[in-house]
């Protein structure tokens, strides 16, 4: 029964982590640099499932080390290497999450694939530095006990304490502190709410930001009110008395573009003047007899529309909306959505890391007791 369960876990680990690697490498939405951590972590878990767990299962079922002594030493070194790499990967991911939340602008510009690969290489070097000493320095090895051979971890106190601190306790402490800090940052940002600087209040409609009324004012004037003229008098035109009384009332918040706005060339007819009504035919094309406005306002000339902008038609003309309608609010909401995704991902990782720590803590705690008090703190073999 134990062999069947462990075999299922081995296959499930290999299949699940292979899907993670395949998804990150093939999906465009998952090709963010930080997802390289997941690829490397999944590779470490696959190596554990293929090179470590099967031999551990055989050792437990047989009760002795069936394979060669040399492979035992390599097996123990690889065991420490892959397990330490997995834990340190989780520590690196937690630090990446923290910097992405606390220093979003500065860190996201530096989060390049090359930097992430350098961090991953550092993770593997740390794991190698912890796992290789038993292969290089074997210490004073007494005679092998008679009977069936055993394959056990290094029992020297200096290695037990150093490997336990480097492989588990130090990364675990870092992860707990980092995720506590991320929680405090998320809580503080939720208290601030949407009333951040430059952000629209809840229930307040987003107002479009029309562009100024002339090419020279596009780069200098921030609002439409400073550059648009609401009546024809802004261009030197006057309306006959009584014309204003016959005009159809409009939304006071709607502004029109003056006739001085440059027009687009008509196909095959050259550039028109900025004043409408040069001929009866043109008046019929762009004007409407239902709204008897002055010649300057009877119809608005075609807009020279910048790329990405939109035109809003009104009774008294056309309003050119800016390229980013509600740019400040839109940026704020995009930033808020990004932070929400960061927090959700951080929460998922915190759950995964919490379960991981609970699974590893009993082993490292009992393993460390053998170095602290080898005579009085012996852990039962079955529990270990």
Curated annotation (Swiss-Prot):
<feature type="topological domain" description="Cytoplasmic">
    <location>
        <begin position="181"/>
        <end position="348"/>
    </location>
</feature>
<dbReference type="GO" id="GO:0004938">
    <property type="term" value="F:alpha2-adrenergic receptor activity"/>
</dbReference>
<feature type="compositionally biased region" description="Basic and acidic residues">
    <location>
        <begin position="240"/>
        <end position="249"/>
    </location>
</feature>
<comment type="function">
    <text>Alpha-2 adrenergic receptors mediate the catecholamine-induced inhibition of adenylate cyclase through the action of G proteins.</text>
</comment>
<feature type="topological domain" description="Cytoplasmic">
    <location>
        <begin position="26"/>
        <end position="36"/>
    </location>
</feature>
<feature type="region of interest" description="Disordered">
    <location>
        <begin position="192"/>
        <end position="289"/>
    </location>
</feature>
<protein>
    <recommendedName>
        <fullName>Alpha-2B adrenergic receptor</fullName>
    </recommendedName>
</protein>
<feature type="compositionally biased region" description="Polar residues">
    <location>
        <begin position="218"/>
        <end position="229"/>
    </location>
</feature>
<feature type="transmembrane region" description="Helical; Name=2">
    <location>
        <begin position="37"/>
        <end position="62"/>
    </location>
</feature>
<feature type="transmembrane region" description="Helical; Name=1">
    <location>
        <begin position="1"/>
        <end position="25"/>
    </location>
</feature>
<keyword id="KW-0449">Lipoprotein</keyword>
<feature type="topological domain" description="Cytoplasmic">
    <location>
        <begin position="96"/>
        <end position="117"/>
    </location>
</feature>
<keyword id="KW-0297">G-protein coupled receptor</keyword>
<keyword id="KW-0807">Transducer</keyword>
<keyword id="KW-1015">Disulfide bond</keyword>
<dbReference type="Pfam" id="PF00001">
    <property type="entry name" value="7tm_1"/>
</dbReference>
<dbReference type="InterPro" id="IPR017452">
    <property type="entry name" value="GPCR_Rhodpsn_7TM"/>
</dbReference>
<dbReference type="GO" id="GO:0005886">
    <property type="term" value="C:plasma membrane"/>
</dbReference>
<feature type="topological domain" description="Extracellular">
    <location>
        <begin position="63"/>
        <end position="72"/>
    </location>
</feature>
<feature type="site" description="Implicated in catechol agonist binding">
    <location>
        <position position="167"/>
    </location>
</feature>
<feature type="topological domain" description="Extracellular">
    <location>
        <begin position="373"/>
        <end position="381"/>
    </location>
</feature>
<dbReference type="GO" id="GO:0019229">
    <property type="term" value="P:regulation of vasoconstriction"/>
</dbReference>
<keyword id="KW-0812">Transmembrane</keyword>
<feature type="transmembrane region" description="Helical; Name=6">
    <location>
        <begin position="349"/>
        <end position="372"/>
    </location>
</feature>
<dbReference type="GO" id="GO:0030168">
    <property type="term" value="P:platelet activation"/>
</dbReference>
<feature type="transmembrane region" description="Helical; Name=7">
    <location>
        <begin position="382"/>
        <end position="384"/>
    </location>
</feature>
<dbReference type="InterPro" id="IPR000207">
    <property type="entry name" value="ADRA2B_rcpt"/>
</dbReference>
<keyword id="KW-1003">Cell membrane</keyword>
<comment type="similarity">
    <text>Belongs to the G-protein coupled receptor 1 family. Adrenergic receptor subfamily. ADRA2B sub-subfamily.</text>
</comment>
<keyword id="KW-0472">Membrane</keyword>
<feature type="site" description="Implicated in catechol agonist binding">
    <location>
        <position position="163"/>
    </location>
</feature>
<dbReference type="GO" id="GO:0051379">
    <property type="term" value="F:epinephrine binding"/>
</dbReference>
<dbReference type="InterPro" id="IPR000276">
    <property type="entry name" value="GPCR_Rhodpsn"/>
</dbReference>
<feature type="transmembrane region" description="Helical; Name=5">
    <location>
        <begin position="157"/>
        <end position="180"/>
    </location>
</feature>
<keyword id="KW-0675">Receptor</keyword>
<feature type="disulfide bond">
    <location>
        <begin position="72"/>
        <end position="151"/>
    </location>
</feature>
<feature type="site" description="Implicated in ligand binding">
    <location>
        <position position="79"/>
    </location>
</feature>
<feature type="topological domain" description="Extracellular">
    <location>
        <begin position="141"/>
        <end position="156"/>
    </location>
</feature>
<keyword id="KW-0564">Palmitate</keyword>
<feature type="transmembrane region" description="Helical; Name=4">
    <location>
        <begin position="118"/>
        <end position="140"/>
    </location>
</feature>
<dbReference type="InterPro" id="IPR002233">
    <property type="entry name" value="ADR_fam"/>
</dbReference>
<dbReference type="GO" id="GO:0009986">
    <property type="term" value="C:cell surface"/>
</dbReference>
